[in-house]
Structures are given as C-alpha cells and as structure tokens.
Regions:
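Membrane-embedded, hydrophobic transmembrane alpha-helices
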Residues: 1-28
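Membrane-interface helix-loop-helix junctions at transmembrane boundaries of multi-pass membrane enzymes
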Residues: 25-28, 212-221, 257-270, 323-349, ...
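Membrane-interface alpha helices of multi-pass inner-membrane proteins
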Residues: 221-237, 248, 274
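Active-site lumenal/periplasmic loops and adjacent helix-entry segments of GT-C-fold
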Residues: 37-200, 237-238, 423-433
Length: 581
C-alpha cells in the first residue's frame, strides 16, 4: 500500500494542476496557481515540523547565521573555530539581518525565504515561457515541469529499478545523484542559497531573452543581468560559471546567426557580466583562499570514464522528456522555422549547462548543480509539448504528468521526514533551546556566561546551534552511536564537511588529534601535546572542554590546567588555564 501513496499523490497533484489550467483565464487564476505551487512546500513544513530545522545541513546553516549575529563577519567556521568560513555566506548574512530585525529563528526565516523564492521563480518561469510561446497554458506547464517534475529517473520506483541493474552499476555507466531532482527539493532545504541561485538564474534567462529578442531594449534588462550575475556571485557562486558560460555560448550562437547586427547587444551583455564580478572579487577571494586543490572543481577533458558516465547518466535522465519532444517534433520544427530566436537561446542554455555537468568534476560531486540548471531550463523549453498534449491527448497528458510527479511525491512523503531527530528543541524568538533540562542548562550557561569568540571542545556537534559558540573542531564521536539512522542537523560527518569546504588536512588532523585526546577511553591522562596546543590558542580565545560522562570528567579533573565552571548531572564544562595553581 505504501508504494501506491506516491502514485495517488501524483495523480491528485495533476488533477489540481489541470483545475488551475481550467481557471487560468480568471483574473485570480495565476494567483491560485501560485498558491498551488507553494502548497507542496507548505505541506512538508506542516507535516514534518522538524524538517524545517534539521533538513539536510540545517544546523550548519543556522550556526553560520549565529556566528554572524555574534559579530563575526566574515564568519568563522562554527566547527573549526578561528578559521574563516570557506563557504558562500551571503545568504546567511541576509538571514542574520532578518533574524535580528524580526526576532525569528534562522529556521523560520529560511522557510519563509524558501516560499518567497519558490513563488518568484514560478512567476519568472511562467513569464519566460510566455515570452517563448505566447501561450498562458504553456507558461503554466513550464512552471509546473521545471520545478516539480522534469524526469522520473532520479527518485521513486524507476530509480530503484535502475540502481538494481548490476551491469550499469558494475561498469559505472550510470551515476545516480538524487540531489539533482526534483528541483523543488532545493527550495525545501535550508541555507537560502541554492534556491536563490535558481531564482537569479531564471532572472538571467528572462533578461537576456528581452535583450536579444527585442529591437529596442530597455536598460532595465542590462541592469537585471548585472543584478542576477552579482547576486549569484554573492549568494551562490558555484552558479556563476554557468551564467558566464551560458552568456558566451548565447553570444556565439547569436553572432553566428545574426552577424554584426547584434554586436552592440553582445558587448553590452558581456560588459554587464564582467562588471558584476568586480564588486565581489574580495568576497570570492576570501571564500576560496586557503582551499586545497583536491576540493576544487576541475575540467575532466581527458577522463574518459567520467565523461562516458556523465553523458550516459544525462541521456537516461532526460530520455523521458526527449521521447515526448521527439513525438512532438513537427511542432518543434514549426517553432524553429518561425525564426524563434528565444527558443534557440533557451536550447543553447540547456546544452551549455548539460556540458558543464558532463565535463566538470570534483571529489564531492558538486557538479550536479549544473545538472539542476540544465533540467530546470529543459523543463521550460519542453512546455510546448505538454501544452499540445493537453489540447489534443488530455488523458495521455494526465498519465504522463502523474508519472513525472512521482519523484516529487516520493520526496514529500518519504525523503523529507523519515529519520527521528537527535535533539528535541523549543523555538523561542531567535534561538533554539534544548528540551532536555540538563542539556538546556549546559547551553544556557555557554550562551550567557562565555564570550562570543570562545571556543569549545565537545564530542557533540550541538554547541554551534544551541549554545551559539564555535567548536575547536567538529568530532563525529556521537554519530558513531547512531550512524545514519537519525538526523542530527548536519547530514554529513564533520570530517566530510570540512574536507568538502577545502580545509587542509594538516589543520583538521592536528585539531582532531588534540580534541580526541579528551575522549580517548584508552588513556586516563591529558597529554602534554594537547595542553601545549591549547595553551597557544588560549592566548587569544577562552578555551572550554565539555565532558559528558564520568570517565571523561575524571580524566580532565586530574589535569591542573582545567577548572570546572559548570556541572549538570554527569555533564560538566572545564575552562582551560595555562596558569598552574
């Protein structure tokens, strides 16, 4: 019965969408569609309240916001105290400002921004499709398909079937990455960065269509290109290469087709992109300086296996919609023969972002972000097919749409709320408080009795959120007790997060050795090496160690360098002092 739930939900969503199409000529039709468009997100937040706080890297993003509120700009890494954050923090600065202004928790602000970004993206996609095909129904299909379901390959029963084909897995022909679809899953996550990037990318597409497809171009569209590029560079710089590559590709295609006639527009577009990067160069320098090369995104021009796997994966992913486009090829040919430059521009962007997914590689697989943009743009382009199906083969259209929505339905029903959380909480104003009295007493002491730049050694990863202070280094000791069976708000291990952000192993390994010394059950004494390392740090910052069991308490209490400053049950806080009594 559980397997039928996504199918039933998909059919219900398709029925609701068809109803929205039916009333789209009503003066409130578009607003009703917008409401329907954000309902899946509202449903997730209402059905799984913890998802809003814990989802994906929820604690990571909240802890960065708290670092900024504490006065750290640029923020330090909350799980690598004192080290600058090698991760885009533009959206966290925005969220921190709203949190301080409205006295709402970061999780609440992230959720509100997600709803706003989703609604604005739906509007922009509708406008883009309207520009392409001059058809309101096609616009509704574009918004629907690009956000909610452009492929059914990545999640659901079909995806599970593909992953069971041993031949594909063994010869590495197919590399499934469920993070890429459905696009709405990006709008459900915290961080307000990826989703803002998708919105700004849609604004970029909308702007260049106006620039190249109108004889007289308002300066406002050059300005919006500038703003979209600047915004992406600040809020989600990984999409900046996609804007640059798409701009150059579109300029090349248009110059080849139109010649010097569009030269002024081409130069104007390139100038906007270049000028938009100048103001954020110091910011980009800050978040990239110090990254090790192994964390970088590189070209995989000579990695045959990678290129073949990425190409085959992309082909399988888009095959369902390609079949439908091929089915409606006569209609597509008619559109292209009408010299529809806007469609050519959109196809160019689809191909460019697809090639970026194929030819770029990174140890963390972060190139999947370009797959998101390609599928998102392909969803807009393919709307003419579904518009025609709706007019001429409505039952087939209903069945196909229901199938395409199965991944989203699976995400809503299962992926967004399966795991129990590790730490029950209460939201009050700007902050999260732990429901367990002893734990809450610990974090209350930390947040009220220690300096904002104090750093802590702890076997848990909770202090950056509940105590709003930095960890000397994030340890994965606690995770070993529950593995991946619970949601701790970080999703990835601390070790992986630091590695993905590009911190040198020399720094992280040293700190991990020092911090782990306190929780090593095989020894009963703090090493001189650990004391010496903390002594250097304590010259600039107060250093505290949290003990959560009797053995660790006894071990730390033996050292003359640590003074107990807090105790609640078996949990205690010790402050490091280089002065020996």
């Amino acid at each position: 019965m559980d397997n039928l739930q996504p199918i039933v939900l998909s059919a219900a969503l398709t029925l609701a969408f068809f109803w929205a199409i039916k009333i789209n000529n009503h003066k409130l039709g578009v607003w009703i569609f917008l409401l329907l468009g954000i309902l899946p997100l509202i449903f997730i937040y209402l059905r799984y309240p913890d998802f809003r706080v814990y989802d994906w890297h929820g604690f990571l993003h909240a802890s960065i916001v708290y670092q900024i509120i504490n006065g750290s700009i640029p923020p330090n890494n909350p799980i690598l105290a004192g080290e600058p954050l090698l991760y885009p923090w533009g959206s966290h600065l925005l969220v921190a400002s709203i949190v301080s202004l409205l006295h709402l928790s970061p999780a609440t602000v992230f959720a509100l921004l997600n709803l706003c970004f989703l609604a604005l993206t739906l509007i922009l996609v509708f406008k883009i499709s309207l520009f392409l095909y001059s058809d309101r129904v096609a616009g509704l299909f574009a918004a629907f398909m690009s956000i909610f379901g452009i492929t059914f390959v990545h999640r659901g029963p079909f995806a599970e079937g593909l992953n069971k084909i041993n031949f594909l897995v063994n010869v590495k022909l197919f590399r499934m990455d469920i993070r890429a679809t459905p696009v709405i899953s990006k709008f459900a996550s915290s961080g307000a960065n990826n989703q803002f990037g998708i919105l700004l990318f849609a604004l970029f597409i909308y702007s260049i269509l106006h620039i190249f497809c109108h004889v007289k171009v308002g300066k406002i569209y050059y300005f919006t290109v500038f703003i979209s590029s600047l915004g992406i560079g600040f809020f989600y710089p990984i999409y900046l290469p996609a804007i640059a590559a798409s701009s150059l590709a579109c300029c090349a295609v248009i110059y080849f087709q139109q010649g010097r006639l569009f030269l002024n527009k081409i130069l104007g577009l390139i100038a906007c992109i270049v000028l938009s990067i100048v103001p954020i160069l110091p910011y980009l320098h800050q978040i990239t300086t110090g990254k090790v090369q192994t964390a970088a995104i590189t070209l995989a021009l000579f990695k045959k296996q990678h290129l073949f796997t990425q190409s085959f994966t992309y082909f399988i992913t888009v095959l369902p919609v390609l079949i439908i486009i091929f089915w409606k090829r006569k209609l597509l040919l008619k559109i292209l023969l009408n010299a529809n430059l806007s469609v050519i521009i959109l196809i160019t962007i689809v191909v460019t972002t697809a090639l970026m997914w194929i030819f770029m590689t990174s140890p963390t697989g972060v190139e999947y972000k370009y797959l998101i943009l390609s599928l998102f743009t392909l969803g807009i382009f393919s709307s003419f097919c579904f518009r025609d199906l709706y007019s001429n083969q409505r039952i087939i259209c209903f069945i196909l749409l229901s199938i395409f929505l199965i991944p989203m339905s699976s995400f809503i029903l299962y992926d967004s709320g399966q795991k129990p959380i590790t730490d029950p909480y209460i939201e009050k104003g700007m902050y999260l408080f732990h429901k367990q009295p002893n734990e809450n007493a610990l974090y209350s002491y930390i947040s009220s009795e220690t300096k904002p730049d104090a750093l802590f050694v702890d076997s848990y990863l909770t202090i950056p959120v509940f105590g709003r202070r930095q960890l000397y280094i994030g340890l994965d000791i606690r995770r070993k007790s529950f593995g991946w069976g619970k949601n701790d708000g970080w999703t990835s291990t601390a070790k992986r997060l630091l590695s993905e952000q590009g911190y040198p192993s020399e720094i992280t390994d040293l700190r991990r050795t020092v911090a782990s010394d306190f929780y090593d059950k095989t020894s009963n004494k703090i090493s001189k090496y650990t004391v010496d390392k903390l002594a250097k740090i304590s010259k600039k910052n107060d250093v505290y160690v949290v003990a959560r069991d009797v053995k660790t308490n006894n071990k730390i209490a033996k050292s003359e360098h640590f003074n107990k400053v807090f105790e609640s049950g078996v949990t205690a806080i010790y402050k490091f002092s280089n002065r020996v009594n």
